[in-house]
From Swiss-Prot:
Residue stretches of biased makeup (Polar residues): 75-87, 855-867
Cofactor: FMN
Family (UniProt): Belongs to the Dus family. Dus3 subfamily.
Protein name: tRNA-dihydrouridine(47) synthase [NAD(P)(+)]
Family annotation (Gene3D superfamilies): Aldolase class I (3.20.20.70)
Any one GO MF annotation of this record: flavin adenine dinucleotide binding
UniProt source species: Mycosarcoma maydis (Corn smut fungus)
Alphabetical keyword list: Cytoplasm, Flavoprotein, FMN, Metal-binding, mRNA processing, NAD, NADP, Nucleus, Oxidoreductase, Repeat, tRNA processing, Zinc, Zinc-finger
Single GO biological process annotation from the record: mRNA processing
Binding site for FMN: 496-498, 550, 623, 653, 704-706, 728-729
InterPro entries: Aldolase_TIM, DUS-like_FMN-bd, tRNA_hU_synthase_CS
Entries under SUPFAM superfamilies matching the protein: FMN-linked oxidoreductases
PANTHER family: TRNA-DIHYDROURIDINE(47) SYNTHASE [NAD(P)(+)]-LIKE (PTHR45846:SF1)
Length: 867
């Protein structure tokens, strides 16, 4: 071999070695960049505050006030402690008195030591307020219409079955008294939604310039009402406090100001703002909240006087002098819209055309779950099969280290369904939840026979074979039901984000280009109890092209029935179901769920195989971490995830449970796990045991961790050869990251564009949670939750060095304009002020406590709790 060839070979070996040890990008220090510090240009950096301006936290000494001054003054010197503070020499004690005095001195010293430790702990606690989490946060539920019938106010006579006889209803149907006490309408400028979609980039920027100011404007700029006098407006502003905003009143040519605003001095109409815009009515042509809407003036018609204005001749609905408006042309246009996802026509109801959200559980199903009699025939059969299999495997291996392989036979599920259907048919009942208890009682004998049939299906022969080969039961030849394949290659996956990954936020990400969405993590036990809040997590917007939900649980007895209930209630509304095997929080881990499943692969095997059996053709995916501690163990799960468990896709977060979000994600280990899975599939295809089986195609493997720029995304794809990447914190801080990745550019997004994103979230939130008082304040709360992450974004135009890094913390800086500076504020009160620009002033009793006490990017105690 020549010297040149030897040199080339050495270089190749070095390159291969570098590939093997690569874990994550390493960016060394330069003249413009120091790792850990965002490289902001000098002209935008603000001087550090003087040390004298930093507030000094006083230590609470209440716990030590009971001690004598002498004991407090001599905490560190035990020899000088005494209870006598006079100038005279201490009296010499003898016998029992001296022993008693020594005990008192020792007790005083111990108390002083405890007080000192408590004071230090208090100082550390005050210190920790700069980081960590605000646990046990409480959010009050604020509602209006106390004592009034909510159904009647929302849907009129169709909303209350006692509408024809109001005296029979426990709640008041007096609409006039409700309007008289109702708070004044909120003001929201009109937005030309249809025209915005057709605008060019230049036209959109002009519209943003017309709609938002870069400097503060007076509050009177946004709300001018023809029906309110100047004195009333001044009194209202004085009562609410001075408010400033960056939102201009509608001055765009696309939405000309209304000149036909009605005028009324009727006391029942004093709360109406005729110039406001209801975001629901503006899009759909009708408002689902009816009279409860906080933007009521935009969709009512003045027809005359109310019973307060003219007691003898009241007009309008319920003597209110008003009528609700329905714009038929807008409704027809809404119903004829194109959707990214819709159910088959056979599964749509008549009201689905008016809904832009799917996956509503049935009222009968939720009621049956709360009563614990929801029919679960598949679950019962599958759990019996797994129990039988476990007992027989225990004969081979008493330690329980052998797990079952392959899918559960489809005949087990089919026979269970047939038995359940036959039991219901004999009694003349359908398989409705109401008759579930009777059906289960009558089918008990048949299920016992089914269990015996399963035991006689050749399992004993397989156990004998396993005993001689030290293997486990092989059911791989039993073909599962036909699953839908997940052809994910390069799709942008938005992670399931607890609290922040709500439907309005997912709609924001859809607009920026995300492809796959997974709903917030739901607890299996709460699903089984029919908890309405938990079942709302599976809600899907029609713009979400690929959508699944994530379940968290620690036992097959919990997760398998939830999977069957989801399939029965939601059906094709879910493209996949995901199992959370990565949640690091103690509350979940201590119950054996989340990342605790990583240490129990046998139990995880039962969960996956059982859920796969009851989900039918719905794919099942898993989300994992590298392990629970420093030792990385997840590659063992990847070796069997597809070949033995039939998982449809797998996502790996490159950190352990102990790391939470500390340190960099280990993408080298992600590559190792992806290769392990593909090698296991290759071995399965080459094995003669499965020669008559269809060739297995490797499932999609996604990586997760620290993706914050398009450069990060494509570098990891190239080095690890994963099928795609899941994006979590990067999307929370800058949701437009999906656009940057697809267009391969660094987007220096303007402050006006970011404020318009807040406007969209407000509209999406009001559409999702409702435009009544409760919905407005729920939207306000989750808007603040979103800003607790978006404020961490450092504008691209302020950086000396690109790309930006997720864990780089910026020094104190100012933006290029007042609005950009406000959007970067870490003060929660500033976030509330931003919500006021679209949702009005919050009630006095409303408050927001941020989940994270600081804007730190990576701390031990302030880690985000997304699995």
């Amino acid at each position: 071999m020549s010297e040149a060839d030897a040199a080339t070979s050495a270089m190749d070996s070095a390159a291969e070695a570098a590939e093997q040890v690569w874990k994550h990008p390493v960016y060394g220090a330069t003249d413009k960049y120091t790792p850990g510090i965002a490289p902001i240009k000098a002209e935008y950096i603000l001087p550090k505050p003087a040390s004298g301006s930093v507030a000094v936290v006083e230590v609470n000494d209440d716990a030590s006030e009971r001690l004598t001054k002498r004991a407090l003054a001599t905490t560190g010197d035990s020899a000088s402690v005494t209870t006598n503070t006079s100038d005279e020499a201490p009296k010499k004690l003898k016998g029992a008195a001296r022993k008693r005095a020594r005990r008192e001195e020792a007790a005083a010293l111990a108390a002083a030591h405890r007080a000192e430790k408590k004071c230090k702990a208090g100082q550390q606690t005050q210190h920790a307020k700069k980081g960590g989490q605000n646990k046990a946060r409480q959010f009050s539920s604020l509602k209006d219409a106390h004592g009034h019938c909510h159904g009647f106010l929302s849907r009129g006579v169709q909303g209350c079955k006692f509408a024809q006889c109001a005296q029979a209803c426990r709640f008041s149907h007096d609409l006039v008294s409700y309007l008289e006490k109702k708070e004044r309408d909120l003001f929201l400028p009109a937005v030309p939604h249809k025209q915005l979609d057709a605008m060019s980039h230049t036209q959109k920027m002009q519209w943003l310039q017309d709609s938002y100011s870069l400097t503060l404007l007076p509050a009177s700029n946004t709300s001018t009402t023809a029906s309110a006098s100047t004195q009333q407006l001044e009194a209202q502003q004085q009562a609410q406090g001075e408010m400033t905003t960056f939102v201009r009143a509608s001055s765009s040519a696309a939405v000309p100001p209304r000149s036909d605003l009605p005028a009324s001095s009727d006391p029942a109409h004093a709360s109406l703002d005729w110039s406001t815009t209801c975001p629901i009515f503006a899009v759909k042509g009708f408002c689902t909240m009816g009279w409860k809407c906080r933007f009521l003036g935009s969709h009512v018609r003045l027809v005359g006087a109310s019973s307060l204005g003219d007691p003898l001749n009241p007009t309008g609905f319920a003597s209110s002098g008003l009528e609700l408006v329905r714009d038929q042309a807008r409704m027809d246009e809404w119903r004829a819209r194109t959707r990214a996802f819709e159910l088959s026509h056979a599964k749509q109801s008549a009201s689905d055309a008016d809904q832009d959200e799917l996956n509503f559980g049935t009222s009968d199903g939720m009621k049956a779950m709360r009563k614990r009699n929801f029919p679960l025939p598949k679950t019962k059969a599958v759990l019996k099969f797994l129990e039988t299999e476990t007992k027989q495997l225990a004969d081979v291996d008493p330690h329980g280290s052998i797990a079952g392989k392959g899918p559960i036979p489809t005949s087990v599920v089919e026979e269970a369904v047939a038995v359940s259907a036959g039991a219901n048919g004999c009694n003349g009942h359908s398989t409705a939840p109401a008759s579930a208890a009777a059906a289960e009682a009558e089918a008990e004998d048949d299920l016992e026979e089914l269990e015996n049939a399963m035991r006689n299906r050749g399992l004993h022969a397989r156990v004998a074979q396993a005993a001689t080969t030290n293997g486990s039961i092989d059911l791989a030849r039993i073909r599962p039901s036909e699953k839908r394949r997940l052809n994910w290659r390069g799709e942008l996956y938005l992670a399931p984000l607890t609290t922040t990954g709500n439907l309005p936020f997912r709609r924001i990400c859809t607009g920026y280009g995300s492809d796959i969405h997974c709903g917030e993590m739901g607890l299996a036990e709460s699903f089984l109890h029919g908890n309405a809040a938990e079942w709302s997590l599976v809600r899907r917007h029609e713009s979400e092209r690929i959508f699944g939900t994530q379940l968290c649980g620690g036992k097959p007895d919990l997760l398998v029935p939830v999977a069957e209930a989801l399939k029965a209630e939601v059906g094709d509304g879910l493209d996949f179901v995901d199992i959370n095997c990565g949640c690091p929080i103690d509350l979940v881990f201590n119950k054996g769920a989340g990342s605790a499943l990583l240490d129990h692969p046998t139990k995880l095997s039962k969960i996956v195989r059982g859920m796969n059996a009851v989900l039918g053709d719905t794919p099942l995916t898993i989300k994992l971490r590298t392990g629970t501690g420093a030792k990385q163990t997840t590659h063992k799960i990847f070796a069997k995830a597809q070949t033995e468990w039939r998982v449809a896709a797998a996502t790996l977060h490159g950190r352990s449970r102990k790391q939470r979000y500390k340190n960099d994600a280990d993408w080298g280990y992600i590559a190792t796990c992806a290769n392990t899975l593909r090698e296991s599939v290759s071995e399965w295809n080459e094995s003669s045991r499965f020669a008559d089986e269809p060739e297995m195609v490797p499932i999609p493997v996604y990586g997760n961790g620290d993706v914050y720029s398009w450069q990060d995304y494509y570098e990891r794809i190239e080095r690890t050869h994963v099928d795609g990447e899941m994006i979590a914190r990067g999307a929370l801080i800058k949701p437009w990251l999906f656009t940057e990745i697809k267009e391969r550019r660094d987007w220096d997004i303007s402050s006006r564009e970011r404020l318009d994103m807040m406007r969209k979230f407000a509209e999406y939130g009001l559409t999702h949670w409702g435009s009544d008082t409760h919905g407005v304040n729920t939207t306000r709360r989750f808007m603040c939750e979103m800003m607790s992450f978006t404020h961490r974004y450092v504008p691209t135009g302020l950086l000396e060095f690109l790309p930006s890094r997720l864990n780089d913390r910026p020094p104190l800086f100012r933006g290029r304009d007042e609005l950009e500076t406000l959007l970067a504020s870490s003060n929660a009160q500033d976030w509330v002020k931003l919500t006021e620009m679209f949702l009005g002033k919050p009630p006095q009793e409303w408050s927001f406590t941020p989940k994270h006490k600081s804007s730190s990017y990576s701390t031990d105690d302030a880690a985000e709790q997304q699995g």
